[in-house]
Amino acid sequence: MQEQYRPEEIESKVQLHWEEKRTFEVTEDESKEKYYCLSMLPYPSGRLHMGHVRNYTIGDVIARYQRMLGKNVLQPIGWDAFGLPAEGAAVKNNTAPAPWTYDNINYMKNQLKMLGFGYDWSRELATCTPEYYRWEQQFFTELYKKGLVYKKTSAVNWCPNDQTVLANEQVIDGCCWRCDTKVERKEIPQWFIKITAYADELLNDLDKLDHWPDTVKTMQRNWIGRSEGVEITFDVQNSDEKLTVYTTRPDTFMGVTYLAVAAGHPLAQAAAAANPALGDFIAECRNTKVAEADMATMEKKGVDTGLKAIHPLTGEAIPVWAANFVLMEYGTGAVMAVPGHDQRDYEFATKYSLPIKPVILTAEGTAPDLSEQALTEKGVLFNSGEFDGLDFEAAFNAIADKLAAKGVGERKVNYRLRDWGVSRQRYWGAPIPMVTLEDGTVMPTPADQLPVILPEDVVMDGITSPIKADPEWAKTTVNGQPALRETDTFDTFMESSWYYARYTCPQYKEGMLDEKAANYWLPVDIYIGGIEHAIMHLLYFRFFHKLMRDAGMVNSDEPAKQLLCQGMVLADAFYYVGANGERNWVSPKDAIVERDEKGRIVKASDAAGHELVYTGMSKMSKSKNNGIDPQEMVERYGADTVRLFMMFASPADMTLEWQESGVEGANRFLKRVWRLVYEHTSLGDAPALNVDALNDDQKALRRDVHKTIAKVSDDIGRRQTFNTAIAAIMELMNKLAKAPQEGEQDRALMREALLAVVRMLNPFTPHVSFTLWQELKGEGDIDNAPWPQADDSAMVEDTTLVVVQVNGKVRGKITVAADATEEQVRERAAQEHLVAKYLAGVTVRKVIYVPGKLLNLVVG
């Protein structure tokens, strides 16, 4: 065995062994308990970042541990390979998205291998290949036939100069990111999947997810947003038209002072013909971003349409305003406004001098002061005619019943959740498999024409999708008729909604899933990824699973039993202010820092002499130039060190602060483990361990070894507190480093201890563990070795610590044999100097003894 720990030599050797032996390839085996460990698949951006490394290290630790428990462990990997960044990069690098993507996949694949992750590479998939997306296309056509897919017009961000649709992130300050033209809202036809048909099940089944974080479940509950309310119809004065609104607060109905409709509402559009101000306002609303978050923060504006609606219970004529905060695609495109009891309605009414009518009393039973804000709390009604004196629930029912009796109101359950718009007017995505025949009939692409293949050999102009720019691509023939293909592509959330299931049968050619394989592996036992995916991806992931279940492909209701959301990786961030007042961010590795005695940064500069502003730790990002390249760290310290630091520096679900001093500490620890194994093996083969021949010191050390095994097993397996597991191994190593290796049983015990340490470290640091296991002559490869078992008999304490009190006050602590009698404990206590002092010249009147824990002597 070589004396020095040289990770660069051993890691490549061990990785080659895994590749040649196909160590982590698995097949279905009914005789073994399965365990499916999955980390969210990466987007092939070009290089791994530390967030990836943390995510995949956590997954690999869990997978390797479960494998050592004897389970049949599936840990696959693939590439979420479609998406907008590839289009931008292709234009910038004068290439097409496909070669850019495949080059990145190859590069990142080598990076993943360099980190020693135990993936079943035979199952690798890339979502941009027709072999993958053909099944998604076929499934979509089946959903269409079931009535779960439909087309309707929906608002998008439109650049009138480039004549193209922009994603929300391509709209900068209301303008196109490319040509700076003012962006408009435009209604275009798009495809939708009816996720709302599953809203109740998606909501109710959250209760089955006992091992998902509560934060994620709460976010999904709020996103689905189930509410119970009343849909109310208003007649429009001097017209046959009607306006329908939905409210969850019918108790405030007598306080309605105006209605607000979307700029795109048919009534507003019609009224604009005779109202130029309204026409201008509708045109202005076309320049509003379509993201809901933007709607919430923008200035609320409106114009009176001149129309009046009739309050169904009071007969009062109420003004109808067009407002930019009402969206046509949300609900009915109209809302009732109660400015006395809704803050948004209040601000709008105040701005435009609309009436404000209070109808709910304060908690003290007085009329509310509405001079500064609305009273939004529920309470008892007043100013509401026959409904005065009713509380929220009674008023809700009474008003709902009265409206229903008049035929103008209906109780309804509503959802905040909207159907999933899956159309994207982009190139780099899976083509939507729909066609329009010459006679105008819209239908799914016939099965024998699937997949609809995206051409990869294209020229990107950065404006129009190549398949939209090429009229020939869309031309096809269906049922003997000329037809045009859909030129929109799928939202990339489509691919990431079912990849986990395809991993169970990636080579299967008869359909989307091989049901036998899928139902052997599914559901996923643990899914690991960032909490930023809580609503979009994780909701679509659950939805798709239910769609596949209802198509008879999977048996379970939910895709993953446990969800672990890893924390972000933070690093120091520094900048200096440039000549024009701009911030120039400097990489932490280029910062020269001074620290105080507590290690805090007090001053920083760079090589060019700029004085740097230290902003503290923040998420590693390109914008702050504070990312640390994992490859650089692996080349400097080895993959095992990087992995160990990642798992030790912080609990898995908390943020991790990148500190190179911590990485150095992890490296020193692995050198110590190597050194101890080297010293042990250089003494020759150890004899067999004879437990009965151990002296007290040896028994105590063996007790520590087995207590550590028990703790580490619990920390990794049940608690998933990996940092405390590593801390326990480090503590044991400190004891082993001081243990003698002279006697035969000393060496036998050391071998038992080191074999346990190396196996406990194996999930974290697999390369060095593999090598040291061989040096210790462990049986077979460590990859097939069982997890160490704690010996209960070794953990039994020979001695115990008893607290001695005199008249209830602690006067000493004594160590006695675990099986000592009360008499022996009293004798031993009397020998303690301090205890003896308090017993001198007094009589012991009473003795309270809690065996093995406490002796209280009552004296007088």
Swiss-Prot record:
EC number: 6.1.1.4
InterPro entries named among the record's database cross-references: aa-tRNA-synth_I_CS, aa-tRNA-synth_Ia, Leu-tRNA-ligase, Leu_tRNA-synth_edit, M/V/L/I-tRNA-synth_anticd-bd, Methionyl/Leucyl_tRNA_Synth, Rossmann-like_a/b/a_fold, tRNAsynth_Ia_anticodon-bd
Subcellular location: Cytoplasm
Keyword ATP-binding found: yes
SUPFAM superfamilies, sorted: Anticodon-binding domain of a subclass of class I aminoacyl-tRNA synthetases, Nucleotidylyl transferase, ValRS/IleRS/LeuRS editing domain
Protein name listed in UniProt: Leucine--tRNA ligase
Family: Belongs to the class-I aminoacyl-tRNA synthetase family.
